[in-house]
Amino acid sequence: MKQLIQIRCKNNKKSLKVEAGTTLSDIFKQLNLTLPYPPVCAKVNNKVEGLHYRVYNAKDIEYLDISSPSGLRAYTRTLFFVLCKAVQDLYPGTTVRIDIPVSNGFYCDLNIGRPVTEADATAVRNGMQTIINRAIPIRRHEVPTDEAIARFEEMGYHDKALLLRTTGRLYTLYYDINGFVDYYYGSMLTNTAQLTLFGLEKYYDGLLLRIPSMSNPSELGALIRQDKMFEIFQEHHRWQNLLGMSTVGTFNEAVREGYATEIINVSEALQEKKIAHIAENIAGKKTVKMVLIAGPSSSGKTTSCKRLSIQLLCNGIRPVPVSLDDYFVDRELTPKDENGDYDFESLHALNLPLLNKQLMQLFNGEEVELPKYDFIKGRSVPSGKKMRMRAGDVLVIEGIHALNPELTSQIPEEYKYRVYASALTTILLDDHNYIPTTDNRLLRRIIRDYKQRGCSARDTIRRWPSVRRGENKWIFPFQENADEMFNTAMIYELAAIKTQAEPLLEQVPENCDEYAEAYRLRKFLSYFLPIDHGVLPPTSLLREFIGGSSFSY
């Protein structure tokens, strides 16, 4: 007799009895459910699974399409898989590294023994489209890890073999498209025909894989040149080559061999060298009267600002901090968002006329009384603090809007030096699996919110989408305005914060929506061997989040 199990669908709040062992894909057909876009994965008891997944016990299921973050990740991973197969079909024995998110896509380094041409981009794009048009099933396999390692070694995927060796897992999942196998962290689509939209073109010395926009999945994300951002990525690769590691497997191997302290020391020294370089550039521009530092949430811009101030002093420049928090308009004048709530992240929550007026007065040698914002009363009050700039002074202004031209629209451009600080790139899981740098920032924020504000990981994860929307509106559009970009991520970072982040993530209960994200973060942290964060220097940028900094915040 066939065993029936009960499924509760969160999309339509209905229950359904199905045979044990039915796939999520087949359950969706039985539900007769309609989503804005076709389903690409599902939350099963608040854990994201691919539609291959078979259900053997009663479950709560929520189907996800490409307009969700988890859905877009599954779609993108499957595009990576098809790209890698197309490259192997066209250039057997060569490799492709899916490297960095840039220009609303992903930069792919195609190693074919010669410069990549427009013809190569066209050939790979056509090869991908052929695979998609053939509607090839994507099969999921679970095998002993030593068997998977042997398979990947035979294929020349030494980065994957090394990663799997260092995880200590008994079994490993991998996928295949018509005999071409690969390993991916996270759920995948079930058929190549589900990939209805992508773009591929030559970009610098490699390829740019373009993906659908999450806000409008029927269109590709806008192609925006990010030349300064790309140069930072290239610089980071040079640092990785110096350290001899670019993937988690090589990092874990170095940690096992006792090089953790050396990795930390070199990473910190390289970062300090970059900060010193920025300070020297500022000192070389005699017209600069203010340094503007911007970055998204948990980017480490506060510590970056403090360390840059020290380097400015070393160059004979006195940094004078100016807090944008004191320039908020009175609360009743604060703009409201689409929900009718005060939008404190809006540029227009700041008193821009007063800010520009006082800046010009300072630059003209006048004395001004700086404002003081009373956050309890919600209005500006007299501070009694007066300021006059002296020879050798440079104002240092840190805030999310610092790169927005409208913030200092009345200030001559030659007076300004703009710095964008963010966790831009760190390390790859392997050549086909990147780690989103937003995950670095989210983990930093989870730890800091718990330590400094008493917030749970669940609360931080719940608020994160709202934070990201604000960043997309007020920060990222202006990042290319920077005179300098500073990558605040470090190659050892995730291994150092792992021991603090994991216990907080484990406290997120399975019966809440935030569990899926907490589980995903725990899963990718599990790939890293932990390192002792006690050896981090007191000026380390990570200390802003994990504690023990010699700076005051």
Regions found by a protein language model. Name each.
Residues 304, 308:
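Hydrophobic positions on the alpha1 helix immediately C-terminal to the Walker A/P-loop
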Residues 320, 333-376:
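Conserved nucleotide-sensing/catalytic segment adjacent to the nucleotide-binding pocket
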